[in-house]
Amino acid sequence: MTSRLVTPQLAEQFKQYPLYSQDGKKKDAICLCVFFIGKVRWYVLEGQPEGNDFTLFSIVVGLADTEYGYASIKEMESISVDVGHNLPKIPILQDKSFKPCPIGNIPDERLQSFLSNMYDREEV
């Protein structure tokens, strides 16, 4: 299943990273892609088709709290922001310049603060 957000290339990548495949990898988990709208980011770690939808597991940054969570591609594709002034609504988009890498290497202060709070305390 492909869609506006899940391209054939991304669907192929997800075959290597189905849900639960990166459990326990912490900061070494590979982030496959990034979706965004405004200052909100979905750092996607895993995904797989489920029926006529796609379920993603990601870290969401930029909402009230940063957290791990599951997201439906169909729901994400239905989200848009109306900025008014007769401008078109802004949908969630994929950061096409992003290259897969360990989540701990991504230069987003909010993300790294979340990861440090989750995992650095475990090592003490």
Which residue stretches match the model-derived regions?
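N-terminal domain-onset segments
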Residues: 1-38, 122-124
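Short linear sequence elements within intrinsically disordered, low-complexity coil regions
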Residues: 19-22, 47, 75, 103, ...
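An amphipathic, hydrophobic-aromatic interaction surface with interspersed Lys/Arg
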Residues: 31-53
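Acidic, aromatic-enriched beta-alpha/helix-loop junctions
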Residues: 45-82
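Low-complexity intrinsically disordered segments
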Residues: 84-124
